[in-house]
Swiss-Prot record:
The glycine cleavage system catalyzes the degradation of glycine. The P protein binds the alpha-amino group of glycine through its pyridoxal phosphate cofactor; CO(2) is released and the remaining methylamine moiety is then transferred to the lipoamide cofactor of the H protein. Its EC number is 1.4.4.2. It is an enzyme of class 1 (oxidoreductase). It comes from Yersinia enterocolitica serotype O:8 / biotype 1B (strain NCTC 13174 / 8081). It catalyses: N(6)-[(R)-lipoyl]-L-lysyl-[glycine-cleavage complex H protein] + glycine + H(+) = N(6)-[(R)-S(8)-aminomethyldihydrolipoyl]-L-lysyl-[glycine-cleavage complex H protein] + CO2. One of its GO terms (molecular function) is glycine binding. This is Glycine dehydrogenase (decarboxylating). The glycine cleavage system is composed of four proteins: P, T, L and H. The modification N6-(pyridoxal phosphate)lysine is found at residue 708.
């Protein structure tokens, strides 16, 4: 054996696990594209003036087991205290059947947002269940399929109120003074850019004000007081003021639905339904409104439609409200939401059912009553007489009580003057009640729980008369059928089988980077050291989180060429918003508040103009030339016309057209020349890492899609993370937090997310990826991603023209196939090709973005040459089928393309098509051995929007 010990140790083994092609396969692909090495390929494609002289210094690769052991050591520094802090976050008991079969299952967490409904019926059904759950609990007509967090939902409710208000001259938004502080923080940030005046006071004070378009109330106040707002809501309705109510999802199980009391919008966090606190996230927010506001509603909405055979099928409804279509006129900039977490919450409700949820909520409330009675009996005063799960207890020596609590391994809420806060939850036990009583009272005799239980069960008045829910909840069969683990396991598997995820095939979506989410990267997110921490716990209890976040931030600084990173934004869209806010605040600090114009290329992603509008900027579109590059003449003209009003440009690199623009540095220089800042959208960082950086190119700020480039899974439409990297001059202006002091923040800026570090519990995924890849592996990943895209473009360019290329005919990490000439000649559209790919076992590429009538393909570095060839063979076979239509062998109205996809039910039914059953479902060799069967035929989008129905359908429709 000639290998030395270092070679045998194989510390870079994970790189070969992550990158799908072997060295031999890479050489074959290099030969096909006309390069002799990866380095040569990059030299040919990437402009020389932006190539880094050396890779970023992020260190060497570690093996999976080394990285896991290292991260375990870091996680062990987190202290798992019992947290009764509340404030919108509670410990939970995640049902193991959901943990194992969903959260730890790549069939669920590697899927993409369900833009292709035919391959997404499983998670669409789970999301429809989430909407039904939300409608039942809130008492409103329409619910969305989740928002990013409760605070973001509050800000969205304010925006909805202004859009829908009939009081067009009103510019005030009223917030009750006992909403959660982090909610108020995010609302104030959003209101600042919208130019709204926010008034914070006791709820009844709103009746003394004029010019109010919307009101935000919280049913269970942040310090625990339970409010009956029915009379106030009725009066506000008379005044045509739109009302929003923040609600606790567990409390809603027992309490009167705010919608029944007159609220127009109800929202909150679904975290308590089975999702760990995770130091702040990710968690799904629920959001519901009255039917009259449906066109103003933010976020995804799942609707019931029908397929080509007339069968019930689900789809995303009313997409014309969203950023990818309406751009700066969209209701929201949200692209990714929190699908995986919403599905966990919906399945938590399915598993427990209405009786189980009532038992859990009832137990929490009963324990709160028992503790309250014991404390009052012992002479302690409670600040409120009505509550659900939270007590504010007045104490004489607060410091001593808090010190005693810490000695018991307990966190109480500390920020209430002269009192401590205690929020109970589903994990609270009898023993916990005894400990809480002892630390507060110091009475060794303890709490007579059974005696107090008998007392409060007879005469509890902690929930007001009229505030107890009277109507039944969750009467749909789906919530009353799957309560044994066997039935639940099979139901979840049945849903999973309907969907196409990365565990079955490549998902070649352009601008989405559907790469491997390795098992080793996913393992740490369920460790209790990461999962169980409250986001507002004392910082010394989160030392492991701080170290992990600090290391990850430093790596991202090195990989982006920036000077600082902010981890707060919990999606790419939030990152865009945060970055633009930093630019806005920077200009204001220099007395240049007039700078409000944001230049955006015509090819930009829809979130760019939507985010700019949210940040209070005016969008001016910059033209692209015939090669798809930014038109420098038009850029100079638009920048010059903007003059002292120029704020920034938003540019994606490589461009959304899939090429490395050779003039990118000149673009940056032009904008800087006119006093603007450069926002470089990080959507395509997978073609930059290790090769160049935004900072080296000349940008000032970027967001990073950790759910693209750095391996956080898409989860079927979330979670995501969108931290921003900034140059030093923008660092003082990144988001801060009103509850937690963030290290390094020299000025206090408003928050964009509820938690200080966003969805902190999924950051270990990106930490693991970078640690296991090292500098060399990260660069190689980018190189192979570029190789794979060029290999596909080279193999397919004769059959499908590649719309945009660089000067040498190359592309970056994705390519755009132009279907327009084919459609004009044959009538076959990009939609037909996308749906036919399902029969071949593939998710479609991105359709009609950034150019209508095209398909954008991004293979990522994780796919093997075998899988790339399988996709290429499918596309070539489809091209041959199109030729048959062109020659008249198949009629345009009846052929495998326009009829795609084909289902099992169709296969065994009556067959009158001019092509065989075998060709329909097994179009090429190899499909049979791993056949994906869609559960529905092509969706009827027009029917779905004309007949909007967004609740659960009869169970028979699924059978």
């Amino acid at each position: 054996m000639t290998q030395n010990l270092s070679q045998l140790e194989h510390n870079d083994a994970f790189i070969q696990r992550h990158i799908g092609s072997s060295a031999e396969q890479q050489q074959q692909m290099l030969a096909a594209v006309g390069a002799n090495s990866l380095s040569t390929l990059i030299q040919q494609i990437v402009p020389a003036d932006i190539q880094l002289p050396s890779p970023p210094p992020v260190g060497e690769a570690a093996t999976e087991h080394q990285a896991l052991a290292e991260l375990k050591g870091i996680a062990s520094q987190n202290q798992r205290y019992k947290s009764y802090i509340g404030m919108g976050y509670s410990p939970v008991l995640t049902p193991p059947v959901i943990l194992r079969n969903m959260l730890e299952n790549p069939g669920w967490y590697t899927a993409y947002t369900p833009y292709q409904p035919e391959v997404s019926q499983g998670r669409l059904e789970a999301l429809l269940n989430f909407q039904q759950l939300t409608q039942d609990l809130t008492g409103l007509d329409l619910a969305s399929a989740s928002l990013l967090d409760e605070a973001t939902a509050a800000a969205e409710s304010m925006a909805l109120a202004k859009r829908a208000s009939k009081l067009k001259d009103a510019n005030r938004f009223f917030v009750a003074d006992d909403v959660h502080p982090q909610t108020l923080d995010v609302v104030l940030t959003r209101a600042e850019t919208f130019g709204f005046e926010v008034i914070v006071d006791r709820a009844e004070k709103v009746l003394e004000l004029d010019g109010v378009f919307g009101v935000l109330l919280q049913q269970v106040g942040t310090t625990g007081e339970l409010h009956d707002y029915s009379a106030l809501l009725a009066e506000l309705k008379k005044r045509k003021i739109i009302t929003s109510v923040a609600a606790d999802i567990m409390a809603l199980v027992l309490l009167t639905a705010p919608g029944k009391q007159g609220a127009d919008v109800v929202f909150g966090s679904a975290q308590r339904f089975g999702v760990p606190m995770g130091y702040g996230g990710p968690h799904a927010a629920f959001f519901a409104c009255r039917d009259e506001f449906k066109r103003s509603m933010p976020g995804r909405i799942i609707g019931v439609s029908r397929d080509a055979a007339g069968n019930t099928a689900l789809r995303m409804a009313m997409q014309t409200r969203e950023q990818h279509i309406r751009r700066e006129k969209a209701n929201s900039n949200i692209c990714t939401s929190q699908v995986l977490l919403a599905n966990i919450a919906s399945l938590y409700a399915v598993y427990h059912g209405p009786q189980g949820l009532q038992r859990i909520a009832g137990r929490i409330h009963r324990m709160t009553d028992i503790l309250a009675a014991g404390l009052q009996q012992a002479g302690l005063a409670l600040r409120f007489t009505h509550w659900f799960d939270t007590l504010t207890v007045e104490v004489k020596d607060k410091a001593a009580v808090l010190a005693r609590a810490l000695s018991f391994g307990i966190n109480l809420r500390t920020d209430i003057h002269g009192a401590v806060g205690i929020t109970l939850d589903e994990t609270t036990s009898r023993e916990d009640l005894q400990i809480l009583f002892t630390l507060l009272v110091g009475d060794n005799h303890g709490l007579d729980i059974d005696l107090l239980d008998a007392k409060v069960s007879q005469n509890s008045q902690s929930i007001q008369t009229g505030m107890l829910r009277q109507e039944p909840i969750l009467t749909h069969p789906v919530f009353n059928r799957y309560h044994s683990e066997t039935e639940m396991m099979r139901y979840m598997h049945r849903l999973e089988r309907k969907d196409l995820a990365l565990n079955q095939a490549m998902i070649p979506l352009g601008s989405c980077t559907m790469k491997l989410n390795a098992a080793a990267e996913m393992i740490p997110i369920t460790w209790p050291e990461f999962a169980e921490l409250h986001p507002f716990c004392p910082p010394e209890q989160a030392a492991g989180y701080q170290q992990m976040i600090g290391q990850l931030s430093q790596w991202l600084v090195q990989l982006t060429g920036y000077d600082a990173v902010c981890m707060q934004p919990n999606s790419g869209a939030q990152g865009e918003y945060a970055g633009l806010l930093a630019i806005r605040r920077y200009h204001e600090s220099r007395n240049q508040a007039s700078r409000h114009i944001c230049l955006i290329p015509s090819s930009a992603h829809g979130t760019n103009p939507a985010s700019a509008q949210m940040a209070g900027m005016s969008v001016v579109v910059v033209a692209c030339d015939k090669q798809g590059n930014i038109d420098l003449h038009d850029l100079r003209q638009k920048a010059g016309e903007a003059g002292d009003e120029l704020s920034c440009i938003m540019v994606t690199y490589p461009s959304t057209h899939g090429v490395y623009e050779e003039t990118i540095r000149e673009v940056c220089q032009i904008v800087h020349q006119f006093g603007g800042q450069v926002y470089l959208d990080g959507a395509n960082m997978n073609a930059q890492v290790g090769i160049t950086t935004p900072g080296y190119i000349g940008a000032d700020v970027s967001h990073l899609n950790l759910h693209k480039t750095f391996c956080i899974p898409h989860g079927g439409g979330g979670p995501g993370m969108g931290p921003i990297g900034v140059k030093a001059h923008l660092a003082p202006f990144v988001p801060g937090h009103s509850v937690v002091q963030i290290d390094g923040m020299t000025t206090q800026q408003g928050a964009v997310s509820a938690a200080p570090f966003g969805s902190a519990s999924i950051l270990p995924i990106s930490w693991m990826y970078i640690r296991m890849m090292g500098a060399d592996g990260l660069k190689q990943a980018s190189q192979v991603a570029i190789l794979n895209a060029n290999y596909i473009a080279t193999r397919l360019k004769e059959a499908y023209p590649v719309l945009y290329t660089g000067h040498d005919g190359s592309v970056a990490h994705e390519c755009i196939l132009d279907i327009r000439p084919l459609k004009e000649a044959t009538g076959i559209s990009e939609m037909d090709i996308a749906k036919r790919l399902i029969d071949f076992g593939f998710h479609a590429p991105t359709m009609s973005f950034p150019v209508a009538g095209t398909l954008m393909v991004e293979p990522t570095e994780s796919e093997s040459k075998v899988e790339l060839d399988r996709f290429i063979d499918a596309m070539l076979a489809i091209r041959a089928e199109i030729e048959k239509v062109a020659r008249g062998e198949w009629p345009l109205e009846d052929n495998p393309l326009v009829n795609a996809p084909h289902t099992q039910a169709e296969l065994v039914g009556e067959w009158q098509h001019p092509y065989s059953r075998e060709l329909a479902v097994f179009p090429v060799a190899g499909v049979m051995e791993n056949k994906y069967w869609p559960s529905v035929k092509r969706l009827d989008d027009v029917y779905g929007d004309r007949n909007l129905f967004c609740s659960c359908v009869p169970i028979s429709d699924y059978e």
